[in-house]
Amino acid sequence: MMSYEQQQYLTQQQQMNNFTNLTNLTNMNSVNHNFGLMQQQQLVPQQPQLAPPPPPQHQQIPISTQSTPNSTSSTTTTTTTTTSTTTAPTSNSKKSKTTPSNGNKPTSGMVTPIISTPLQLSSVNTPLQQYQPNSQLQPPSPIIKKSSLSTTPNNINNNNNNNNNTNTISPKTKGGNNSAPTPTYSSATINSPYLEVIEQESISVENVIINNRNSNVHIVVKNTSFVLKIRSLDLNKINFSSSCVKAGLYYVNEPLKEVSFIQNPPITYVGSSCKNGEQFAIDIKISILSSQHQGNLFYIMVHVSPENQKSITKDGKEAIVPTTSSTSTSSSATSTTSSSTSSTTTTSSTSNSSTPGSTMGCINGGNSILSFPIRVVSKVDHIKKDPNGVCEKKQTFIDILTDRLSSLENLHLTQSALLSNMLKERGIPESEYSFSEYSEPELISCAFSTSPPSSPFSISGGGGSGGIPSQSGIIKKHKKPSGSSGYGDNKNTAERFLECFNRVIKVYKEHYGKKSFELSKFISSLDNDEKNILVDLLESFTFDESSQVKSLDNNDHCEDCNCETCPYKQQAEQFMLLSPVICFPSPAIKSSNNTNNTNNTNNTNNNTVVTI
């Protein structure tokens, strides 16, 4: 007896053997199948081909194929092709009859292979179907069908007929009532030698390279009128008093293309000519932006034609521009012309075509000229912006100081140049005056003095009686010190300027005590003549007797007396009124301030009493 484990082992071995046998069988079948396909592909050119189909009739056309020699069973498939259906393959028991193309009699009872010439092989409509086991016939590929249709004799005739039909139907190659193709214009050839642009208004002009040439682009604001003036260089050829002027808006491209629109025209204009007809001024408004048209620039094309000039409309008919002063309305423009010496033209282009000839009418014998390139913006502020989109960097405090210092240095240079010129005119050598920069200690010392640091004169300087210092003092004041201090050498100009500025502010923030004015010092500094004048002025004053009596009684008045009826203050006030040149603090202001202070203290005391 076999154990259970041995039985399981045997069953596993049998299953493995069966699996290997099945894989071997499938591999052999696939190898045989591939070998048969390779032989079939090698024998495809030797297989019988079909004869070309008869003239187009609703008949069944049998198609027969010869079986391969290596196949186990020979099969004959016949496909019957009609205009609407396709039949299944027939059996071997039926005998098909084929009609050879060479005119021989057909044989019955067997399938006759048809050997075609290379020309006939290329002219077969239906391609051969390769043998594939367990598969149906597939439709021919479109590439083979296209090539076969193009080489079939019947199809060649059909193609010739189609070509003949297209040649007879094409309206553009034959002459007749059809309109001619619209011409294309370029900016280099459109300008007339008899016209010239003499003025074009704009809010600003910028230089731009267009078609490898430098051009001045005129910037205008949307829906804002500007004037375009043109001039005739030959009045015998062009006279604006007897001409019709039209204008249109075009892109700055090659070839020129008109700006298309749906309902509202992009340009409106009013024109007028001078008395002799030499110049013509056009007041133009543009209602579109350059940003709305991908940033394109615009031209204004002005076309001038005689009054009786024939023009071709969009329908292909000829139209004559009227010579009278009446208003005429057409599909492209509305113009008013006058035969007098002064003519006015009002035009609003309403054409919806993008061809250059639509708005201009047809240019038969007319002359045209282009304006300068135009860029249309919505606001004047947009001109100041950088077109490259570079934002302005925010300046720091140090940057602002350096800018101010640079401007001050420029002013210093210009002023020094003016001073040197003045010295040369007066014959004074420049070597005696050295206008150099001040050092920091000098700036600090000048801040405490009464004179500004920029003035070459000092009040405290010991000069002559007139207060004018000597020349040596000026030179000493302005000469640069020989021993330069090393303070601040490693710092930049902005930091040194900031430190000096802070020091000046500290000086002005300090609280100074009240300085009393001493009359004795003032009187001692006067000459005899000045003292006599002062005595005469004092004698002319009139004083009240009460004040004199009080002055005799009150002998304890000091210089800083705060009495309201002090005689010294009254005399000082009268003296100050007669001598406005001398500037010193007014005692009247002092007294008023003191009275105000006393009143305020009294009020506060009263308030405190009431609250208690």
Curated annotation (Swiss-Prot):
A GO MF label: DNA-binding transcription factor activity
InterPro entries, alphabetized: CudA-like (IPR040430)
Compositional bias of kind Polar residues: 103-113, 129-138, 175-185
Residue span of region Disordered: 46-113, 129-185, 313-360, 457-488, 593-612
Bias (Low complexity) ranges: 58-102, 143-169, 323-359
UniProt GO cellular component terms: nucleus
Cystine connections: none
Top-level taxon: Eukaryota
Family matches, as PANTHER family: C2 NT-TYPE DOMAIN-CONTAINING PROTEIN, REGULATOR CUDA, PUTATIVE-RELATED
Name the UniProt record assigns to this protein: Uncharacterized protein DDB_G0287317
